[in-house]
Amino acid sequence: MDIQSVLQKGEGISAEFKRAESKVPDNLFETVCAFLNRNGGIILLGVTDSGKVEGIKAGMVEKFCKEISNLSNNPQKLNPTFLLEPAVIDFRRKKLISVYVPVSSQVHRCAGKIFDRSVDGDYEVRSDDQIRNMYSRKSAYYSE
């Protein structure tokens, strides 16, 4: 993966940047859930929304990777679970974490809520029609 091109393109339907200087972002799994439910994507931790590379505090990178892997396997956080494998990237003498999230054949929930991805944001899916449409989209896509 070419980090420079991801940064140049900016956030979009399949790319999300999150600051993570001293902790894993609270809304990380909303994005994971939205990517699983839509087209998949890449999350870069240590980058601002505008694409500025800030990096992650020294000594926190391995802790964050373990936390992300553990939470992705926790049905209270992400259901059904989907084990993520964060990757550490050295970029411009700063540490980033890259989380690749593929599209999933299932509809996922984050803390009991369904999220979808649109343009460059994660949105909670609340209406019965939207939820039905998501299940139909997944069913049609994975049964062909």
Say what each PLM segment does:
Residues 1-144:
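Conserved N-terminal catalytic/coupling substructures associated with nucleotide/phosphate chemistry
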